[in-house]
């Protein structure tokens, strides 16, 4: 895949999704991928029925949902499979609160 890759570290994405706006003006990307944290649910204080089954050490999480580009998501899953990389699928029924929304 031939492409230009830009990596940007941002802040304030939880407050109005403002963190990456200034960077995107300069870069004008075709696709954005947010690398962010999520919560492991393999502890007694989190309900897996509500939050899903995400295990610490279980591999990166690839989310599906209405704000995730299905083509990009499918491509990430395909690449993980080709590389025999363990990943954890998860779902989000709403915007995620990251700069990629």
What residue spans do the PLM features occupy?
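Acidic/histidine-rich catalytic neighborhood of metal-dependent amide-processing enzymes
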Residues: 1-59, 94-96, 100
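Active-site-adjacent substrate-binding region
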Residues: 52-101
């Amino acid at each position: 895949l031939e492409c230009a890759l830009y990596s940007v570290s941002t802040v304030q994405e939880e407050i109005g999704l403002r963190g990456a706006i200034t960077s995107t003006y300069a870069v004008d990307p075709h696709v954005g991928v947010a690398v962010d944290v999520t919560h492991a649910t393999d502890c007694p204080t989190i309900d897996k029925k509500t939050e899903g089954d995400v295990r610490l050490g279980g591999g990166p999480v690839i989310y599906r949902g209405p704000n995730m580009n299905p083509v990009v998501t499918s491509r990430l899953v395909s690449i993980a499979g080709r590389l025999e990389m363990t990943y954890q699928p998860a779902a989000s029924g709403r915007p995620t609160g990251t700069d990629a929304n």
